[in-house]
Amino acid sequence: MRALTRDPDKHRELAEEVIEADLDQPETLKAAFEGAHGVFLVTNFREKGSDEFKQATAAVRAAKDVGIQHLVWSTLPNVEAISGGKFDVPHFTGKAKIDRIVKEAGFPHHTFVIAPGYYQNFVGFLAPQKQADGSMGWALPLDPGVRCLHMGDIRELGDIVAGAFAHPDQAGHGEYLPLIGDFLSFNEIIETLNGQGHTFSFKQVSKEVFAAFFPGAAELAEMFGYWEAHTYLGSDSSDRIALANKIAGRQPTRFSTWARVNVPIKEAV
C-alpha cells in the first residue's frame, strides 16, 4: 500500500510506502502516480494560496506522462456558463473549467464526479445561528420555498469513485456522476428538522445584507442566488443521478436519515 503526503517524514507509519505528493510541487507527482492504474483527483479551493487550475493541470499532465489508465476528476457545475455570466461563484466554476483539460488529455478512461451540497454543512458553516428574535435558525438570501438544493452525505462520494474505477465500460467515457441523496427546498429542510423535534426558523434577507455578515459572504450570496435561479446542479440531472447510484451500487442516504443521527436535539438548545 502506498500513502501520499506532503510531509512523508512525519507519516512513515501510514503505509508500506510513503511518498511525497504536493499539488503545488508538480515534480513530486510522477513518483506518486507511478505504477497506479487510476487517480482520483481533488483540489481544495479554500486552501490559502492555492491555484486550482495550475494544480489540476500539473496533476493531469503527470498522470498522463506515467500512463494512468483512468482519471476521476472531482468537478462542480460551471456557474458562469449555466447562468450566462449573471452569477460569479469561483469555487464552482474554477473546477468546471478544468473539465476540458481532463477531456483533452487522452486517458483511456476518464470520469467526472460531482460532490453535493454536504449534509455536513448543517453542522458546519450552515449550522443554525441565534437570530435577533432569540430563535435558532438561518438568515439567508434565498427563497426558502424554491426546491434547489441537491445534497448528500459527502462520506458516500467514495462509493461512486470506486464504482467508476470498477466499471469503466459504464462510467469511463466522460460521464458525470453526482452524489445526490436529496433534492429539497430550505422550507423542506426545516420541516424535516422541526419534525424531528427542533424549532428552527428562517428569514430571507437581501444579497446585500448577507454580504456584510462576514468576510467571504458576498461569494456565498452569489452561490445562493445561483441555486435559487438554476438549482445546485444547474440542469435536469436525473439520468446522471440514476447512473451514479447504479455505479455506486446503492442509494445515497436521505437527509432525514442523516439529520436524525447527526443533528441531535441538544444542538438546538
Which stretches of residues belong to each language-model region?
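Cofactor-binding loops of NAD(P)H-dependent oxidoreductases
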Residues: 21
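Oxidoreductase cofactor-interface core, primarily capturing Rossmann-like NAD(P)-dependent enzymes
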Residues: 2-14, 24-34, 41-54, 61-70, ...
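A hydrophobic C-terminal alpha-helical subdomain
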Residues: 172, 207-269
